[in-house]
Amino acid sequence: MSYHRWNSPVSGTVVKDYNLYGSYYSETLPQGFESPNSPDPAAPNDFQAYITETASRAVIFIKADNPKIGLMCFVAVGMAEVLGNEIIVKVGQHINKGDQLGIFHFGGSTHVLLFRSGVNVKFNLHGQEPSLGSHNIKVHDEIARVE
């Protein structure tokens, strides 16, 4: 099982947080059937835009200590069988990069990081392309850098 706790991508102050309740095991009708050869086992990953809009989500706005970042938003997206998103930080709390923000309760998941316009973010894919064969990036390893 993958790690289902959320860690802050930046140091800063929690400005606002809330849960958006959504679907459970929602899929689009054509999901997984784009391939002319057979159903696609990667379909849940390929349809993350849909899942991000319909699934249960936890939203945390953080005013980063780094002025190059400013206000940013972390969105935890519960995929497939996630039963809930638990936010453990509080509004007004100062957090450090790597501190736990919350946790998914049972099941699959993904995350979204939103930055304001003009923030130059360079992602580190650790020498791999996103696919079913890619490996998890270790907790606290760099996933992106603000330039």
Please identify what each model-predicted range represents:
Residues 1-147:
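Contiguous, well-folded functional domains in the mature portion of proteins
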